[in-house]
Amino acid sequence: MNAGVIIERGASPWQIFQQGPEGTAPIRLEGTYHLVRLSQELPLAFSQVPPAKAVIKARVALESTGESVIPWTECEIPSEGTWRVTFPAVPAGGLYRLETTMTYEGWDGLSCTRGDMVHHVGVGDVFVIAGQSNAAGRAKDPVADDPEPGVSVLRPSGRWDLASHPLGETTGAVYVGHYENHNPGHSPWLHFAKRLKRELGYPIGLVPCAYGGAPLRWWNPEENGALTQNMLEMLGDYDIHPKAVLWVQGEAEGYENSAETYLDRFTAFVRAVREALGQPELPFLTVQINRCAETKDEALDRQWGIVREAQRMAAHVIPHVCCVPSADLALYDFIHNSAEG
């Protein structure tokens, strides 16, 4: 039974909106409204109210106190039974509650004025996670890394959620371009996001798009680029222009003997992503590959060394790319970083 104000589009529970340079983000809501009267006796019965002039209002409130951040704002009614509103400058922070209500001529105290709400919404920074298994998270050792309100994840299901390990698990997945064939484990990104949130004082969102075993050619549109297309689809569906790309990849190049061209191909990948998003200075925060402890293979070691050097050089020759080493991190197995790392 639809009664009162219904939110149909615009924001989801746990969603983090990327702030702009001014430290704010626009949030748009739209939906329908229904004039309904409740019976005076139980069990409740619902009956339609004759058409009347309705006023729909919405506000942004702090979830912790109920205090209005943006006060009740009258919504536009483009046609009878529909409404929409845009809050053009919701400040960085949260978590927020988006709330609606209605009034209308002839209200008698029993007719519904209730409205839908969207809980746990924040404005802050959103990071997209790309690369292969050490970005996706494959280690399965125990990790003390609790979820924390204010850190959210856009799951492959297309739903925003409280961020928790494993970030990229595929329950109900609708974005299947990076559909893992087995369950991922933990990754460093939840810890990363919690640290950022505490230092910066506003929410952080994560969009995991990494795929285990992925060579660079699956990301580079000049070769294959299927994973980049999948990533852009996820970002586009939620109109996300991320704060930065978190990138851990390169292990596969050793097995494909393609390390010598890594720098040129990574440069092409970065350029393509920036052009597609219209963000020419989009930062890429990259992690050098660690090591492989499976076998003693001098050819593989050489390939990995070339990749590491290419990753180091990328931070010098591509603007807004930075690189951190990982060779001192402990391994969970022959190739994946452990919880200790």
Q: Model-derived features: where do they sit?
A:
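Cell-envelope and extracellular/periplasmic
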Residues: M1-G341
